Amino acid sequence: MKTYRIAAIPGDGVGTEVVGAGVEVLKALAARDGTFAFQFDHFDWGGEYYKKHGRMMPEDGRAQIRNHDAILFGSAGHPEIADHITLWGLRLAICQPFDQYANVRPTRILPGIVSPLRKVNGPELDWVIVRENSEGEYSGVGGRVHQGLPIEAATDVSMMTRAGVSRIIRFAFKLAQSRPRKFLTVVTKSNAQRYAMVMWDEIAAEIAKEFPDVAWDKMIVDAMTMRMVLRPESLDTIVATNLHADILSDLAAALAGSLGIAPTANLNPEGEFPSMFEPIHGSAFDIMGKGLANPVGTFWSAVMMLDHLGEKNAAARLMKAIERVTADPGLHTPDLGGTANTRTVTNAVIGAITAENL
């Protein structure tokens, strides 16, 4: 029997609750399947670790998880610690050195969930957003000078490379090719940003020739927000820069009903490093410890993890279980307008997994 080693990193806030729920569900799924198992190694990195040690994770933290098959992550963010410290000290400290350059965020309206778009019932909104996850606006290149003085200045340099842009656009074309519609939208801001964004457009046109069976178009990012709201059915696979896709994917999650159900995969497609899977929602300290966090985003992220590991049947079973639960309004958490809690939803998904008719 294959045993997968999973690094479980809850992080901060409700991360502990949703990752714990995810571990329970994955254990139940493995027991139901019977052909594979999980070994979960738990790491207490995050804001509380920072308060004790002055850093978000140990100096040898990456070495500790380097040989795991995958990483299940919760959230990064602590009300007593600056956001740039929590993000760069933990999540990005894993993503970038592990070259998880493809951030993949599927978006669709699950059964039983209502979109705020009044004309959309479900099939019209079925997207996958591909976010460049290693460079661009979040390259970490920049600095501050003359701090505290009237002449203080700061820069954040958006660093784009031909290699980085080429690999994410090629990844997006391959993903679009694997989907029924075979359609890709490339999002930039090349009308105003005339160097790196123009390079994106040019590289997209070059790589498109490798995929003659994939139709594609390009959009300016501000116009893209309108298209997502007004013509969601016109979109399928979307690729954009680190910053642009970060923003667009949050909009997408809201249009699909809630950030609480949205998943993310941070992929190293070549398999040289472990990939990381996490819900989109943040640490949500306002509801921490109340048992109100929606675990569906973590469960859906676990589906993506299973698919990445090659456990296609188990991934499909878990997705069906999730959809069976979301279809019941009585199992909706407060972010979806319901009164269910994390425990109730987790138990329901486990019950669906073990049901004979799934």
Task: Walk through the language-model features, giving the residues of each.
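Short glycine-rich or small-residue beta-strand-to-loop segments that form or flank ligand, phosphate
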Residues: 5-14, 72-77, 184-190, 300-307
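Glycine-rich phosphate/diphosphate-binding loop of Rossmann-like nucleotide-binding domains
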Residues: 7-24, 28-29, 33, 149-221
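Buried hydrophobic positions in well-ordered alpha/beta secondary-structure cores of metabolic enzymes
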Residues: 12-15, 69, 130, 172, ...
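Buried hydrophobic packing segments
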Residues: 22, 26, 204, 298-306, ...
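N-terminal beta-loop-helix "entrance" segment that forms/cooperates
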Residues: 35-58, 228
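Glycine-rich phosphate/nucleotide-binding loop
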Residues: 47, 104, 227-330
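N-terminal glycine-rich phosphate/adenylate-binding segment common to multiple enzyme folds
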Residues: 50-155, 243-245
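Glycine-rich phosphate/pyrophosphate-binding loop and the adjoining helix
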Residues: 140-186, 190-194, 312, 317, ...
